[in-house]
Amino acid sequence: FLDRALRSEFTQYGRFFKGGDLLDLKWMWDVVEKEYPLNQADLFANHPEFYMVLTHAISGDATYIKASKDNILDGLRASSSIPVLTRQAVDIFGEPYFDGGVADALPVHWAAQQHDVSKLMVLRTRPKNYYKASSKGDQLLAKYVFQQKRGFAKSLLSRTQRYNDSVQFARSASGQKILEVCPPDLKNMAGRLSQNKAKIRYSYDVGIETGLKAIEDWKNL
């Protein structure tokens, strides 16, 4: 990650200002798949119920796609394609998709409704005390960038409330046991577009530590 994520092929502000993607996720996924191919035979050997949450680039609706050998690579690329940072949606079976963060950033409501789900692990990328504030940026994007895609624009304007509702649900739902896993609120954590190797390495190590603790907490839930 410290190598490929910091290469100029991946992040290019010059390309972005000329109308291209800031983050070339197709290049990243192609490189990673070539060098470290996903072992799909093992992944799907036991027919797991594995879903990817995406946002339809036109309607703005959340789409929950069951992973298969035919869609997993494009689905994972779509699930990391953040609108604006990546201008082109990812085509999956003829439909355009972006990351699920617009329509359903924390799909805990949907997961809780699935058959035989008695406990859930909710992985957040924000500290525990974080709630999403109303964003003028979302309002501007909805009005000017996505004005021709009214469904997506409408979904963008309501995502703050959906996110905060999901956080509250994760902490108050009575039907399931829910483990909420959050990164610690530390100043040295890397931001989304960080190019600082030390911060990225530190954040990775914090993530490993947090993940190991989450595994133990899950066993005891």
Model-derived features: where do they sit?
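Patatin-like phospholipase
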Residues: 1-221
